[in-house]
From Swiss-Prot:
Motif ('KMSKS' region): 580-584
UniProt-recorded name of the protein: Leucine--tRNA ligase
Pfam family, one: tRNA-synt_1g
Source taxonomy: Bacteria, Bacillati, Chloroflexota, Dehalococcoidia, Dehalococcoidales
Keyword Cytoplasm: yes
Gene3D superfamilies, alphabetized: 3.10.20.590, HUPs (3.40.50.620), Isoleucyl-tRNA Synthetase, Domain 1 (1.10.730.10)
Organism: Dehalococcoides mccartyi (strain CBDB1)
Reactions catalysed, as given in the entry: tRNA(Leu) + L-leucine + ATP = L-leucyl-tRNA(Leu) + AMP + diphosphate
Family that this chain belongs to: Belongs to the class-I aminoacyl-tRNA synthetase family.
Amino acid sequence: MAEKYNPQETEKKWQDKWAADRLYHASEDSPKPKWYSLTMFPYTSGNLHIGHWYAEVPADCFARYKRLRGFNVMRPVGFDSFGLPAENAAIKHNIHPRIWTLNNVENMRRQLKTIGAMFDWDREVITCLPEYYKWTQWFFLKLYEAGLAYRAKAPVNWCPSCQAVLANEQVVDGTCWRCETPTTRRDLEQWFFRITNYADELKDHEGLDWPEKITAMQRNWVGKSYGAEVSFALDCPTAFEKEIKVFTTRPDTIYGVTFMVLAPEHPLVEKITTPENKAAVDAYIKKSRTCTEIERLSTEREKDGVFTGTYVTNRVNGQKVPVWIGDYVLQSYGTGAVMGVPAHDERDFVFAQKYHLPVITVIAPSEYDGKPLEVAYINEGVMLNSGPFNGTPNTEGKEKVCDYLAEHGWGKKTVNYKLRDWLISRQRYWGAPIPMVYCEKCGIVPVPEKDLPVLLPEDVEFRSGGESPLKYNEGFVNTICPVCGGKAKRETDTMDTFMCSSWYFLRYTSPGYDKGPFDPVKLKYWMPVDLYTGGAEHAVMHLFYSRFFTKALRDMGIIDFGEPFKKLFNQGIIVSNHQKMSKSKGNVVTPDNLVAEVGTDAVRAYLMFVGPWDQGGEWNDSGLSGMSRWLNRVWNLFTEEYTPQTASAEAERELKRTLHQTIKKITMDIERLRFNTVVAALMELSNSLAKLKETAAISAENWQNTLQTFALMLAPVAPHIAEELWANLGMKYSIHNQNWPTWDEELAKDEVITLIIQVNGKLRERLEMPAGISEAEAKETALNSERVKPHLLGKTPVTVIYVPGKLVNIVVK
């Protein structure tokens, strides 16, 4: 055996052998139960950073553990490779996005292989390749056929830096999710998916093992609210409409309406604005278009508006109500119109105070004295100034007012959602082309399935303007109508890259299949994903879209399940000097350098040891060095000669107890994904074994069996050194094809326990006792303890509480 462990040499040797043997190739023919382990695939930015490793390594450890537990594990890998960065690189460096992307794929593939993960490389997918995006386009056509894809003109989020449209989910605090530039609004013809059709299903996570914070974020994103749609009478000579509808969650306050506010984008604004108010209204609309939705909805921003000059009539009491416009109202939510009840809504109260609008109290607090309110009253109370509902508790009034409105044809109960349809159009080149054409005679026509994929042209001119480069490529744009054979033009927008990642987990089940997006038989075997790991930042984007996509495919009869991921786990982040790593801060840790310095296994073990996986931890170079030294000590433990002397029964019992306790702890902790304590337990075991080895009191057979068990538990954490140690023990290749060790409860029991003795809950003594002590013996020993007796003098024991094997609490008075 080698005297000193050489991680780089050993790791390269085993990685090459595993690859040559296709050790981690997953087959559907296995008699074992399946386990689909998946980590969110990386975007092809060019280099893996330590955050990628932190996402992959613990997930790989668990996948390896499941393999040893007898599961048929599939752990595929691929690359999310369409997107704006590639196009920006093309503009900046004068390189084609395809070349830039595939160069990055090659580098990242090399880096991923150094992780030593049990990736099944036969299943690799790359979303920018035609053999993949052909099926992305096929899914678009299926959604179109099902009425779930449509084209409409709508105000959209626009990033002036990226020169691209953003979905609502891609605007974070009023800025672009990618470059953090403040976004604005534009009106464009866009393609949408009717994700709102699935609002109720998407807020329901029953049967899923997902973090509560993610399910809460998705429920809040759907934003389901119950209320009423109420119509106010409109009598305006310049509008043929005879009413304006509002959505309200407070129908019990209908008698307190003193104004109405329309969104600046509301289609009635232009029609109802009087000539004398037109200039002010137009100026306000222009100003509002420079604000993002986040800014418009901000609770810290002062609410303002402009009067249109027109009134509507509140039908329940005949009151005339002025109609204003205000940018805090969004056309995309509800009806784009809200009723103002300043007495019972804080926002409306501030608006009314600012513009000297009336405040009418219609819900009375118990101590109400009839005086004007100084602040909005938003709690429960009794209705007043409310016609036939005076004296009615407002909690009952909500239902009664809804019934009253419905009886008179003035309104109805309704449910509203904050969720908007998914905007998928992008005015960029590097994405999957939308497979639609425009014919003057036939209108909008889908590309026939037989003509897929619609390929991206190679000869494009990249520009930094806000229009797709495809728009200026005549060879791409000009085509033939599939219906009439006449001249037609292709859609020049490409799809949101989240479209590609909404189904990649399905493709992994049969990536080489060419008769459809996946082989139905293999899909049925592998799906759904058993454990999906990745960042929480994808809660209302990738994770949300993937669930919609899966449910839509189910309803189309393409698949027979409605949820893609059974269990979801979000890892934390690794920080440096308490700061998130970034190039600008100069604190990015590059895995390539670490592997060259200490080897893959040391990096793997340290990442799992640094902190709870869901919380992350602080990167520390000295900690990594310490992990490297520990692996060297493990190597020495195995390779330094052991010559047993006279076997000791006591030492043998201690060895078995320590070993079986460790098997139990590691098994339970790894099942809970507590990898930091798994590594800690391995360290403790190695220290215990080193001490026992010095006694030379363990038989050669037991020592050999112990080392085998240790290697098996080490294998998921540090697979390379474990494989080498296993081979050095003369065991059958490969350690990763063996069975996980089991523990014996009897052997794991302590012979001696530490019993805590309390008097009235205060610690008075710790006693070393035999592990099998009875309750009566424990109580008697506690009462007779020399340290306890002084605390019992002059007092009468009321009761003695015994917690088996842990504590005796004597209650006295």
